Amino acid sequence: MSKEKIALAYSGGLDTSVMIKWLKDKYDAEIVAVTGNLGQQKEIENLESKAYSTGASAFRFVDLRKTFVEEYIWRALKAGALYEDVYPLATALGRPLLAKALVDVALEENCTMLAHGCTGKGNDQVRFEVTFASLAPHLKILAPLREWEFTSREAEIAYALEHNIPVSATKKSPYSIDENIWGISIECGVLEDPMVTPPEDAYQITTSPENAPDTPASVEIEFVKGIPVALDGERMSGLDMIQKLNDIGAANGIGRLDMIENRVVGIKSREIYEAPAATILHFAHRELERLTLEKTVFQYKKNISQDYANIIYNGTWFSPMRKALDAFVDETQKPVTGLVRLKLYKGGISLLGRNSPNSLYNEELATYTEADTFNHKAAAGFIHLYGLGMKTFSQVNPGL
């Protein structure tokens, strides 16, 4: 009788490396290790040999980068999705796509179980399992970190050393790092104390702003209907643009975020993020929206941006609500076409200029020179009607 198969979302990090051995022994099952490429740099080398040497019976590497950029990142950018006005949702955006890829492989390999390496008090367990339930409700879900005997990363490291499992984490530097092309999240270790300044060795790609070049860098980004299409006059794929902006931004200290955030499970956590390209593109996109969106649309979209960010963060990407919000966002982005020029300097971004064929800025109406075409006399009647409700209230309710 053949053994059951477990499809494991495998990153090659400490948790999932230990997990292959642990799942194989506990369930007497074959482990299909599945890794999705979301543009991470450090984690993909030698993953296949590492998975097999740790006990996996099969390994699948799925290149998700193009899909990630075009169907996930650009949707979030157009929506202006920044969780609690700060986090560009790099890890959160990647989870539903990774979960979908795991389900796809599991069905192809006739697996009966899905396993992930998410902690029992984190957000990712929600994101993975809600996606699993949406796409493959008949498959059993395993969450080893909620049930195994290890109570700390140090215990996992000891287990790995005992069973000759190669891991990069050490007891001296136990950071937990998740990386994709949209950003990097760093947690654990000394970072758990919110009063501790993040050590420089916690940062993976960005130069310290103090050590960034003394000469500012400038970039010009072209958007078409809310989507970036060209950098400094050169048309390129979304993947190439994000990679280039990550390099430019990181060199200039852009995109370091230190945040206390509200997790799905009800606790606050301290998170360190690096997201150079995301920080630059969100800044540029927002400035172009200021130029091209009608006032009420611009102001109302702020609410939608938060709703969209919450959907991503809370793991409900495959919900009807997200699809409904996409329809609204796509409508708002029709005029968001133009150029934005930015200065990057020692961790800061400043605006150098912007223009659009759909600009709602009318210099003849805005100017205070003789070229002014604004009808000043019309203001008196407008103000009378605009303030009539408050005037009436005060007359009826004096002193209130």
Curated annotation (Swiss-Prot):
It is an enzyme of class 6 (ligase). It catalyses: L-citrulline + L-aspartate + ATP = 2-(N(omega)-L-arginino)succinate + AMP + diphosphate + H(+). Its main location: cytoplasm. Gene3D superfamilies: Argininosuccinate synthetase, chain A, domain 2, HUPs, Single helix bin. Pathway: Amino-acid biosynthesis; L-arginine biosynthesis; L-arginine from L-ornithine and carbamoyl phosphate: step 2/3. One of its GO terms (biological process) is urea cycle. Disulfide bonds: none annotated. Belongs to the argininosuccinate synthase family. Type 1 subfamily. Homotetramer. This is Argininosuccinate synthase. The lineage of its organism: Bacteria, Pseudomonadati, Chlorobiota, Chlorobiia, Chlorobiales.
